[in-house]
Amino acid sequence: MLRTYQPKKRHRKKVHGFRKRMSTKAGRNVLKRRRLKGRHRLTA
């Protein structure tokens, strides 16, 4: 079986990071929802 998840720190940050979230309206909404929900970790 192939291992499909090959983690890379850079890719994870580039795709799911805080700055990426802040760069779009939808991303800011994601952060807002996670803050309202009380998440300790907002982004990857």
Curated annotation (Swiss-Prot):
Check the record and name the InterPro entries matching this protein: Ribosomal_bL34
Q: Does the keyword Glycosyltransferase apply?
A: no
Q: Can the keyword Ribonucleoprotein be found in this entry's annotation? A: yes
MF GO annotations: structural constituent of ribosome
Which residues lie in coiled coils? none
Please give the residue ranges the record annotates as the region Disordered.
Answer: 1-44
| One Pfam family named in its UniProt record | Ribosomal_L34
What GO cellular-component annotations does this UniProt entry give?
A: ribonucleoprotein complex; ribosome
The biased composition feature labelled Basic residues covers 1-23, 30-44
- Keywords (A to Z) from UniProt: Ribonucleoprotein, Ribosomal protein
Per the record, the GO terms for biological process are: translation
The text of the family note is:
Belongs to the bacterial ribosomal protein bL34 family.
From the Swiss-Prot or TrEMBL record, give the protein name.
Large ribosomal subunit protein bL34
Q: Which organism is it from?
A: Caldanaerobacter subterraneus subsp. tengcongensis (strain DSM 15242 / JCM 11007 / NBRC 100824 / MB4) (Thermoanaerobacter tengcongensis)
